Amino acid sequence: MKTDLIYGVEDRPPFKDALFAALQHLLAIFVAIITPPLIIASALKLDVEKTSFLVSMSLFASGVSTFIQCRRFGVIGARLLCIQGTSFSFIGPIIATGMVGGVPLIFGSCMAAAPIEMIVSRTFKYLRNIITPLVSGIVVLLIGLSLIKVGIVSCGGGYAAMDNGTFATWENLSIAALVLLSVLFFNRCGNKYLRMSSIVLGLCLGYGLAFALGKVDMSALNVEMLMSFNIPQPFKYGVDFNVSSFIAIGLVYLITAIEATGDVTANSMISGLPIEGDSYLKRVSGGVMADGFNSFLAGVFNSFPNSIFAQNNGIIQLTGVASRYVGYYIAAMLVLLGLFPIVGAVFSLMPDPVLGGATLLMFGTVAAAGIRIVSSQEIGRKETLVLAVSLSLGLGVELMPDVLQQAPEAIRSIFSSGITTGGLTAIIANIVIRVKE
């Protein structure tokens, strides 16, 4: 396949070229990796030390996961320049799980459900008629719509501000607005480097304004902690399990398996490799398998599920560098960043409105991606029915959770998430309506 690549998948770029390409990838993914743990920690009201450690371990786990994807071990890994990082898709179910059983239940449920994606990687061709693009589009749309609420809460000051009466003050909203407008401005700049780092620049400006307004509490920093190294400790917070959390998180693993398939396909195409035949199927299967395995590994090291980042496919196009060996540099950078507590500490002190201004836009793009997937399909009578019943029930539960207050605890815990309710409805409705026809 003819391409404009400077370095192909198996080429080994010189150190300088590889390092420069790796830095551009790092700019594109850094904020996306640390945002989920920051949002989850804020929602669960975790202290600075625990938040900092979770951020650091997200960077560490993302580095290890990226190395596995690029290197490939047996059937695990795509052997492409596939970058992995903490997934946004799991935030809603993880927060709901954390409210019930804390951090141990989060890690236990995420690890227990991770084999679902690994199994899907070996049986995906049999599930394609069940988890269709319409179904996956509906779930992605529901994920985005449910996360927008989380972003708005952060813009207002977070859950802590709701408790202490400082929610939605003019300072909080001004900080969030500055970040949002800055990200939009830099994203529309002609300079490609400003575009690539638009979120980082927006966060820096928001952080500066928050500091000037006295919103950054530096007293929470522990100097001794900052001077030390983060030693990854497997199962530091323990693990727990319940069925309802397993089902809610397991459903998202099904969707990330589909997303990973699309990401590996796009990466293969950009890298000038075939997107059909045995070699292609081996890459897709290995990529999805690694997605699940790496999410399990992330749980072991006190981090949240990982997924392949689609934005890095754009960086490959931009740089013309598809060499998987560049992934080794990226992996090393992420691991090193995760070992220094000061990185996690600086971002754990970030006020909620700063994060909210950036994540509001990110979550909106997740919802937009769901709309794009749905609209890529021909929407006939059957598809309209599936879409209508799934969104009605999914959004209904999300907007009015009290509708389940009289239901048994087992039912309430499973269907309290709009993503789970809407996703399961989409799968069942898609099967039933197709059978009826």
Residue ranges and their predicted role:
Residues 53-54, 75-88, 129-138, 195-200, ...:
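Short, non-helical or kinked segments that cap or interrupt transmembrane helices
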Residues 16-28, 168-180, 197-198, 213, ...:
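Hydrophobic, membrane-embedded alpha-helices of multi-pass small-molecule transporters
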Residues 37-41, 90-99, 125, 154-156, ...:
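Generic transmembrane alpha-helix signature in multi-pass membrane proteins
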Residues 2-3, 33-37, 41, 178-189, ...:
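Juxtamembrane interface elements at the cytosolic ends of transmembrane helices
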Residues 1-21, 163-164, 218-235, 269-286, ...:
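Intrinsically disordered, low-complexity non-transmembrane regions of multi-pass membrane transporters
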Residues 97-217, 221, 329-437:
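Membrane-embedded alpha-helical modules
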Residues 15, 41-79, 251-324:
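Membrane-embedded helical hairpins/re-entrant loop segments and their flanking transmembrane helices
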Residues 1-81, 89-99:
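N-terminal signal-anchor module of multipass membrane proteins
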